[in-house]
């Protein structure tokens, strides 16, 4: 099960990396708090329109991998072969980003992709999605590192 956990975590890291390629545009203007330049908003919004709406069924693959990751982690916990701290830490590192994506990041990305809001609100959404993705990337990176170190008995 550990190889499945690291594979799922690695896949999610790759997806986050792609998202961050677009999200990083908003980092150049993070201190202003105002509207992002229109070409930047258009780029980020177009990406999230494709990623959340027009890329189906591929966009559902990400949710499926999150579900597989959590199910595999639950199965691994029932086996009783891993230290409790590893399982609890892993549950937090995988569960928090999943819940954040479900409750905030994906709805914000969908709204941003629709471009129905004011430029100021779209800028806020772009910054929020970027912040969420940075947090999720850190969590998934730590998750993968934990399971790779465990597999290598480091």
Residue spans for each PLM region:
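Interfacial loop at the N-terminal end of multi-pass membrane proteins
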Residues: 2-66, 114-126
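Hydrophobic residues within membrane-embedded alpha-helical segments of Major Facilitator Superfamily
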Residues: 8-12, 68, 93, 139, ...
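Membrane-helix exit/interface motif
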Residues: 24, 63-79, 104-107
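Individual transmembrane alpha-helices with interfacial aromatic-anchor signatures
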Residues: 55, 123-142
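Core segments of transmembrane alpha-helices
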Residues: 58-73, 136-144
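Short alpha-helical packing/oligomerization segments
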Residues: 82-107
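Transmembrane alpha-helical segments of integral membrane proteins
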Residues: 102-118
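Juxtamembrane boundary at the C-terminal end of a transmembrane helix
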Residues: 147-154
